[in-house]
Amino acid sequence: MLLAGGSPQPSFLLGSLKADCVTKPFLQRCQDLVRVIEDFPAKELHAIFPWLIETVFGSLDGSILGWNLRGLHERINPLEFHTALEFLDPSGAMMKLVYKLQAEEYKYDFPVSFLPGPVRASIQERVLPECPLYHNKIQFPASGGVSFNLALNSFEYFMFHFAFCLLKQRNYPQGLHFSTADSAYYILVDKYLKWFLPVEGNVPPPHSPNTGGTVPSPAPRSPSLSFTSYGSHTSLLKRHISHQHLVNADPAAQEIWRTETLLQVFVEIWLHHYSLEMYQKMQSPNAKLEALHNRLSVSSAPPIYPALPGSLHSYQELFQPTEEHVLVVRLLVKHLHTFSNSIRPEQVSPSTHSHTASPLEELKRVVVPRFIQQKLYIFLQHCFGHWPLDASFRAVLEMWLSYVQPWRYVLERSSPVSGEMQNRNVPEKWSTFVQENLLFYTKLFLRFLSRALRTDLVNPKNALMVFRAAKVFSQLNLPEMILNGEQLFLKPEHVIPHRQHRLLLTPNLGGSFLSSWQPPITDTSLKVKSHVFSLEGQDCQYMQMFGPEARNLVLRLAQMISQAKQTAKSISNHSPDSSANQSFLSWFGLGSPDFNGSYNGSDLDEAGYDTIRKTDEHLEKALDYFCQIFRLNPTQLGQLTANVDSSQDDDGKNKLPDCIQSEDGVVLTSLGRYQIINGLRKFDIEYQGDPELQPIRSYENAMLVRYLYRLSSVINKRFANSMGALCARKDFLGKLCRHHLTSSSRKCKKSPITSVSPSEPAAPHIRLRFLASYRTLAFLFIFYILGSLLSLGPLICTFLLLIGCMFYAIVQTLLSEEQKPHNN
């Protein structure tokens, strides 16, 4: 390998490492990389850093897989799994390399073309993005060039590639699928969040491997956001002018600039995906003014302008997050809540933070609204509107429920949890969070109701999701907090003109321009209005969660839950033993064969009857929770349940779907479509043609079906007159022939509106298709085997079989004749 005593050229070092990737196993390659990082100076490591990043995380275009961290699991390859985690650990060799290069202020280019669509379109049209992460980093293309790049330091470059790794196509080992939480990538995300978002103490400073001292923070070009901007008394212009002196003036701020950078990168890469309309709506006047001031720092470069209405016309992105993507974002949300809730009690009050709070404590106070609130809301809106109506939506649901329950991530509890009721009581101190995140509780909840109305609630997984959402929102005090937040938002304004709100809406600034001006209305009301308008715009149409329209949605959902409960209960009451017995009896011809039946299987068959009973319980509890949230009248709810019960036939079977008669015939209503989709009702579809021409069934021999059909056709054609004469006789022989040679069922014309059963005389004919059934063949085989055991020859067995069939035919004829007077 390479020796530290020598000083090979960077190209030779890079070439040697590339050669080792082909010839050496993974463990030895990582050990060699650790020695190289420890032994060689930053000048020589600078040349191999981009190659090493690409080797670990893969290329941005996906042509190089890298270490496939998302597909690396302990159960598949434990040696590589633990080696990769140790190498990429926050205190591991890779981070030592990052800090060593950062100390020398090396820069690395990251193509703008791989950034999320809104940011990419903004930069390509020379519009400065709002996020400070991109300020002073944009490299404009040379004359004639079209590609933009970001000049990043080693830490930023590493985090950009690490975050972008989540957006690439996942590569699983052939035929193997494991939980996302067990992958090396997911575990590393968890490690980085725990390391850079410490609950106790400060962020561990990076240590230089050569001198033992700490690595200095970046020069004034650093992307770190000035912490004075978090205060409510800092103006926009001061924010950027004072930034150049902050890095060296405030040692405490140097400790957490990596935390800021990590959060900004994760949020920008994972959540910054939305439509052009949403992007333009987010460009508030304050954001445009901020971008205008930032032009001062890039005055030597080609002009870059703030976003204007109608700009970014070329932006178009179709983004569909994966379930793994959502699970990782949920992990980020949980860590941010834990980090924010770890603030010292004396720093919770905004009146004291500006004088006594450290930068880390100040970051904890504002990390959720400043970094993630807006983009997570848009991300959730996108998922609620575009995610398929299947069970995979559970990941999105849990991410949403994690965000709206920050009280679940409080480390210190005043007393241990003694029961469910104590867990379900939301402390009053969280009312501020509910008010400042009102749309997460109201609009997203109503969108979830709309999704639930379009799903199959009999499905156990869908029923569980409705139960989970209802249980969370029925927690004690939470509905009252949401109602109070709505009342604050709807509180009439008597002094502030409507158009002045836009100065208070920018989520990046927190309304700092007008912080010294005390409006006549309450601060709480102002915060709620600012939150809603910042996310939805001035022209938003707000639907009250406890208004009449939302209440109608809940009543519709309650009715559908009652219908689904009825269906689940009828399925759970259907004993598997009775089905088995019926199938067993049908082998002996004692069952009722259904030639017109269709396949009734569904996910419920695979789930099992215990799961179906659990589904019934989930729906029952969900209905109770909705009653608690919206205070539904028990009488009204009982009437809904009674209507559902009355819609069932006495024999437990569903009626026809709801239809209306139109000029074009029968048309399904929306309720009828829902009934069919959810299996609540169905049309009685019967085969009206020649039974001999039905499709070959799985229990029939295809060759015999075809042969017997040709044989019966020849017999019916040749002896048609004879069979007709026999059926015309008035004696018992005529009755016998009519019963077995003519169709016993009449063709029926059915519709949801009318039922007409015209009789159509059928010509006498014989049917031999029953002989092609495997069941019949098995009976014949068993019969002849028993005959041979009783020393009966084939001729005698055949004669006895014919005698038995004749006796059976006579008995059937006699029974049918006895039933005719009763039927008439």
Swiss-Prot record:
Q: What gene does this protein come from?
A: smpd4
Q: What is the name attached to this protein's record?
A: Sphingomyelin phosphodiesterase 4
Sorted alphabetically, the Gene Ontology cellular component annotations on this record are: endoplasmic reticulum; endoplasmic reticulum membrane; Golgi membrane; nuclear envelope; sarcolemma
Determine the domain of life of the protein's source: Eukaryota
Print the keywords alphabetically.
Answer: Cell membrane, Endoplasmic reticulum, Golgi apparatus, Hydrolase, Lipid metabolism, Magnesium, Membrane, Metal-binding, Nucleus, Transmembrane, Transmembrane helix
Regarding the membrane, this protein is recorded as:
Single-pass membrane protein
One Pfam family, short name please? mit_SMPDase
Is Lipid biosynthesis among the key words of this record? no
Q: What cofactor(s) does the depicted protein rely on?
A: Mg(2+)
EC number from the UniProt entry:
3.1.4.12
- Give the GO terms filed under biological process for this record: cellular response to tumor necrosis factor; ceramide biosynthetic process; glycerophospholipid catabolic process; sphingomyelin catabolic process
**Recorded catalytic activity of this chain's protein:** a sphingomyelin + H2O = phosphocholine + an N-acylsphing-4-enine + H(+)
What sections of the protein cross the membrane? 777-797
